[in-house]
C-alpha cells in the first residue's frame, strides 16, 4: 500500500500557495494553477516549515485514494509553476511534417488533407524543425493530454515505424512476410 499522501510537499522558493475553503491556488514564475480538492481530504500550509500538508478524516477506501491523489496533484502543481513540464514528439515518415500557423498546429501525416489542431491557450507549442514538436506548460495534465491527442492522430505503425511518437519511445518493429522457397 502506498503512503505517498502522508509525505508533506516542500514549497520551492519563489512559489506562493494560498488555500481558501477547498480551493488551492499556486502561483510561480511559470504561471498560476488552481485546484479544487475533494471534501474527504484537508489541505493546509505549514508556514514554519514551508510545506503543504495533506490529511484525511476517515480511513475508508475513497478517503485513502483521494488523500494520495490530492498530494500528488499539489506536488505536480508546485513543480509546474516553478520549472514547467515539457513533452517532445517526433514525426517519422517520408513526407510527414509539422508546422505552426498562429494558434494552430498543422500536421501532414499521410492523410489526404492536412490536420489542424488548435493549441490550448495555457500551452506553448514550438516546432524546432519539421519533424519535431515541443509542448510546454505549467499544468502536467494538459501538457500530457495535448501530446497524447497529437500522437493519437497517427500512432506509430509496427512494420516501418511511421507515425508520431514521443521522443525516446521505442517502437517494436514486426518482421514482414517471409518468402518461402
UniProtKB/Swiss-Prot annotation:
Gene3D superfamilies: Ribosomal protein L6, alpha-beta domain
Pfam families: Ribosomal_L6
Keyword Ribosomal protein set for record: yes
Keywords: Ribonucleoprotein, Ribosomal protein, RNA-binding, rRNA-binding
Biological processes annotated in GO: cytoplasmic translation
Residue intervals passing through the bilayer: none
Keyword rRNA-binding in record: yes
SUPFAM superfamilies assigned to the protein according to its UniProt record, in alphabetical order: Ribosomal protein L6 (SSF56053)
Any one annotated GO CC term: cytosolic large ribosomal subunit
Molecular function, one GO term: rRNA binding
UniProt record similarity statement: Belongs to the universal ribosomal protein uL6 family.
Assembly: Part of the 50S ribosomal subunit.
Described purpose of this protein according to its UniProt entry: This protein binds to the 23S rRNA, and is important in its secondary structure. It is located near the subunit interface in the base of the L7/L12 stalk, and near the tRNA binding site of the peptidyltransferase center.
UniProt name for this protein: Large ribosomal subunit protein uL6
Species of provenance: Rhodopirellula baltica (strain DSM 10527 / NCIMB 13988 / SH1)
Amino acid at each position: 500500500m502506498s503512503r505517498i499522501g502522508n509525505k508533506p510537499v516542500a514549497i520551492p522558493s519563489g512559489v506562493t500557495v494560498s488555500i481558501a475553503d477547498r480551493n488551492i491556488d499556486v502561483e510561480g514564475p511559470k504561471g498560476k494553477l488552481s485546484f479544487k480538492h475533494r471534501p474527504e481530504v484537508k489541505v493546509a500550509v505549514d508556514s514554519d516549515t514551508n510545506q503543504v500538508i495533506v490529511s484525511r478524516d476517515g480511513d475508508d477506501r475513497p478517503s485513502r485514494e483521494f488523500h494520495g491523489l490530492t498530494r500528488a496533484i499539489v506536488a505536480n502543481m508546485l513543480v509546474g509553476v516553478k520549472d514547467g513540464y515539457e513533452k517532445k514528439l517526433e514525426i517519422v515518415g517520408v513526407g510527414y511534417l509539422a508546422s505552426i500557423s498562429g494558434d494552430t498546429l498543422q500536421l501532414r501525416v499521410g492523410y489526404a488533407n492536412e490536420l489542424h489542431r488548435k493549441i490550448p491557450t495555457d500551452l506553448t507549442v514550438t516546432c524546432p524543425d519539421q519533424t519535431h514538436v515541443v509542448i510546454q506548460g505549467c499544468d502536467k495534465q494538459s501538457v500530457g493530454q495535448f501530446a497524447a491527442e497529437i500522437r493519437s492522430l497517427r500512432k506509430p505503425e509496427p512494420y516501418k515505424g511511421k507515425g508520431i511518437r514521443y521522443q525516446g519511445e521505442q517502437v517494436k518493429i514486426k518482421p514482414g512476410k517471409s518468402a518461402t522457397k
